[in-house]
């Protein structure tokens, strides 16, 4: 049975009864159709094949596109290396099936869905180029644009399907004898008085009414495309025009159309920007029939693909960054795929077995002659990164990004049937998808990471100017209140239980200062208001009686300021937990919506059977406008105590609102969050975030709980400090709380490898208080039991790694079980992940430990 707060329920019922005379009830339709798109036929692009290649060139790069295939080459003029949009020998791949060969030969692939949810994949090679329904344009700004019509359509030819004899004779008079002979071979002349026994006279007259008055020439069934091309060429020479074709088609009853419903017009624009190739998809120009929603797009699926004879690796942004070596043989393991910024909580899911997430939008390829990174600039919030090795489906190693264009979820029509109807967004997003390919003469992953750092510092000047303390950052999280079900006047009621009161928080601060831990230390106080860790809607800030008085909280904040320890007050802004009318929350009004138009009510999931846990209360994702009001309430409350602000969700979780009446895309929410964080930074407000999505990391003061180990995909060969290199010396970051980690030793070693600070979570109360609660993760947080170990661990860490945290990371390598990270001041940090001592560079690194060699070079 779910926990219910009966007292609140009674109060709400009384209030509703009081309001009843003033209430007017209406029945609302389940589905709003005011925003539905009209179904329409998609016009096809005309076939265009210029005589010469499309070329763009600057001092660094040369781009050359073949209009016959839309394949292109990108030459790095600094090294002479040529990058290919598709492998040269894809058609002769010995293991690839035809569908995979088409993908390799395509610059674009897409999927669309039917109402049943079944998806179909199209590729530009099979469903556009081979049909000739595309065009290539050199634009006025020097960019190259390719317009694709992708679908199961026949190529249109500028020639008559059927034509009356009088008109045919006019054109034949201009033909050579050879051309006349060919036309007579490709067309059959029908005479109503001399039909064959197999001819259906009535059907012919119905299809070709002119046949009653004159002979009609009809293109023979089954004529191959190369013969149609010959006919088209002949008619073009004698002046046959589009107007002629329109007239001839008008004389045919139900002549048939080559336009199919499942056709998608998608454009790609290529432009050079210094040593970068920028690829764009203008979303405003997408066209498709609403009955066939375009669910995803993959751009340049095989760009830079490495073959079985090549040396190199794929870079994917898993954890701190990961490399997949070409041809590593792990074909029995699943291919790599992860979603940028994690799950969209406005999407329905019935179970959670494995949640993928990546925090920065970069992938890349490295080979013997150079490398590139691809940065997803616009539309990243809709993307996922996929990578696979040669030997599974093809003979090539590939990495690319796939974008979800139109989101959809299954709606259960009735409990009496297993059938479900899929409902989709009523419109696709606007703006652009934009990918920036940056080419490097170097092949190392740290060179690629340094290039990404250069990109961030150029894009965010304030981030470039940031500096941090030279000593290791230390983050201490204090847990204020949890909630437990207790008997109140004989009624089971969920009530806050103090784990660290305001006064106890001040005492812990004093203890930490006494232990000489205050240098570069920050404190995050979580669960301090609105019910505690199971935080109610942040429409306003309400202190928790069980934690103490406002004066005690002020005293804690003042003592932190006196000690020079930044205090961050933590809050949840995008969700409403344990909230109702008394907390200012009305689900029908305030909750975000799934694409099914249902309120975004989210269950807790069981770690045992992975499905929804009916014994736990559900909670709601709130509308973005409500979330931003919660942000402002939290910021104002923190400011009133002279504290910084810590977001439990912003910079970590990112969700859309698919309400058809007030739709907000995930990308729009991303920009809202980024703008708010930039505003806080500009005002001098200290901001702490979790995990560190890239758009938030550049605005943050401190990032905690960074994921260095990712999803531990078996296809991955090695994790590297790619993202830490881009951030190091400009923003402080830590991993997970060591005293709560499953493997604290591993977290410590990885922190030393990637130049991270340390984080710990503390409570003043004993772990016994956690019994009969849902907060077992805090059993290791009892300060009285762990502070001695924390003090020793932090002291050793700071002493060993002194002076590196304000230095740029310049290098990283692995020698056996030892990683070596180098910094701008010459310091080298050695981390031994092995279980025996290791000697490297003349020093011995103990097993499962770390060491540093200070300033061996400048």
PLM regions: where:
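Solvent-exposed loop/turn segments at secondary-structure junctions
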Residues: 71, 152-154, 287, 527-531, ...
């Amino acid at each position: 049975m779910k926990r219910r707060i009966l007292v609140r329920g009674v109060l709400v019922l009384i209030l509703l009864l009081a309001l009843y005379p003033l209430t007017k009830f209406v029945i609302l339709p389940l589905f709003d159709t005011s925003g539905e798109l009209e179904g329409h036929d998609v016009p096809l692009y005309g076939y265009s094949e210029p005589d010469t290649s499309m070329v763009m060139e600057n001092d660094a790069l040369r781009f050359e596109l073949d209009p016959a295939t839309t394949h292109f080459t990108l030459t790095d003029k600094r090294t002479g290396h040529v990058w290919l949009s598709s492998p040269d020998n894809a058609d002769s791949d010995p293991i690839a099936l035809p569908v995979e060969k088409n993908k390799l030969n395509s610059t674009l692939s897409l999927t669309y869905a039917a109402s049943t949810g079944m998806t179909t994949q199209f590729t530009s090679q099979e469903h556009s180029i081979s049909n000739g329904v595309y065009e290539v344009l050199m634009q006025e700004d020097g960019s190259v644009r390719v317009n694709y019509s992708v679908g199961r359509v026949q190529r249109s030819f500028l020639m008559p399907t059927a034509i009356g004899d009088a008109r045919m004779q006019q054109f034949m008079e201009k033909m050579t004898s050879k051309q006349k002979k060919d036309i007579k071979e490709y067309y059959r002349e029908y005479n109503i008085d001399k039909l064959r026994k197999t001819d259906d006279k009535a059907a012919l007259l119905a299809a070709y009414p002119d046949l009653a008055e004159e002979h009609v020439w009809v293109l023979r069934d089954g004529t191959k495309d190369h013969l149609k091309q010959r006919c088209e060429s002949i008619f073009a020479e004698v002046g046959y025009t589009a107007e002629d074709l329109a007239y001839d088609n008008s004389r045919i009853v139900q002549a048939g159309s080559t336009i199919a419903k499942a056709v998608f017009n998608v454009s790609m624009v290529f432009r050079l920007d210094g040593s970068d190739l920028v690829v764009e998809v203008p979303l405003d120009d997408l066209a498709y029939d609403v009955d066939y929603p375009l669910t995803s797009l993959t751009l340049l699926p095989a760009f830079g693909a490495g073959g079985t004879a090549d040396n190199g690796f794929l870079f994917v942004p898993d954890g701190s960054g990961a490399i997949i070596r070409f041809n590593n043989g792990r074909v029995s393991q699943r291919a790599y795929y992860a979603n940028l910024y994690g799950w969209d909580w406005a999407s329905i899911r019935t179970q959670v077995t494995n949640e993928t997430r990546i925090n920065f939008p970069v992938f890349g390829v490295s080979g013997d002659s150079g490398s590139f990174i691809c940065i997803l600039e616009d539309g990243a919030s809709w993307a996922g990164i996929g990578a696979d090795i040669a030997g599974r489906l093809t003979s090539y190693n590939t990495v690319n990004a796939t974008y979800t264009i139109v989101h959809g979820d299954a709606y259960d029509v009735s409990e009496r049937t297993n059938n479900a109807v899929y409902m989709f967004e009523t419109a696709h997003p606007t703006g652009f998808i934009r990918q920036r390919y940056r080419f490097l003469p170097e092949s190392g992953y740290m060179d690629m990471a340094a290039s990404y750092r250069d990109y961030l510092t150029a894009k965010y000047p304030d981030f470039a100017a940031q500096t941090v303390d030279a000593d290791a950052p230390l983050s201490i999280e204090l847990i204020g209140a949890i909630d437990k079900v207790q008997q109140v006047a004989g009624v089971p009621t969920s009530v806050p239980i103090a784990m660290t009161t305001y006064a106890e928080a001040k005492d812990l601060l004093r203890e930490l200062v006494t232990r000489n831990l205050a240098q570069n230390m920050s404190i995050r106080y979580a669960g301090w208001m609105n019910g505690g860790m199971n935080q109610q809607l942040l429409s306003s800030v309400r202190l928790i009686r069980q934690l103490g008085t406002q004066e005690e909280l002020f005293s804690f904040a003042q003592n932190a300021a006196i000690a020079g320890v930044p205090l961050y007050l933590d809050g949840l802004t995008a969700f409403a937990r344990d909230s109702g009318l008394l907390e200012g929350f009305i689900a029908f009004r305030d909750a975000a919506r799934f694409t099914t138009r249902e309120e975004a009510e989210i269950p807790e999931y069981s770690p045992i059977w992975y499905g929804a846990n009916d014994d736990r209360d559900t909670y709601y994702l709130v509308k973005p406008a409500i979330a931003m009001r919660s942000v402002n309430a939290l910021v104002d409350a923190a400011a009133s105590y002279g504290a910084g602000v810590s977001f439990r969700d912003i910079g970590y979780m990112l969700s859309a609102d698919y309400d058809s009446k007030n739709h907000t895309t995930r990308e729009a929410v991303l920009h809202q969050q980024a703008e708010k964080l930039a505003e806080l930074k500009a005002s001098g407000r200290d901001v702490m975030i979790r995990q560190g999505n890239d758009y938030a990391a550049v605005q943050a003061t401190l990032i905690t709980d960074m994921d260095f180990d990712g999803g531990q995909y078996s296809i991955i060969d090695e994790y590297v400090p790619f993202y830490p290199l881009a951030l190091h010396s400009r923003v402080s970051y830590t991993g997970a709380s060591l005293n709560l980690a499953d493997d604290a030793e591993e977290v410590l070693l990885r922190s030393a490898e990637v130049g991270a600070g340390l984080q710990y979570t503390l409570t003043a109360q004993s772990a016994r208080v956690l019994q009969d609660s849902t907060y077992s993760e805090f059993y290791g947080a009892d300060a009285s039991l762990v502070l001695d170990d924390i003090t020793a661990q932090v002291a050793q860490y700071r002493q060993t790694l002194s002076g590196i945290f304000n230095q740029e990371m310049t290098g990283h390598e692995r020698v056996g079980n030892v990683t070596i990270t180098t910094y701008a001041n010459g310091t080298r940090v050695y981390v031994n992940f092995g279980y025996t001592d290791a000697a490297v560079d003349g020093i011995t690194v103990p097993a499962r430990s770390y060491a540093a060699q200070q300033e061996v070079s400048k």
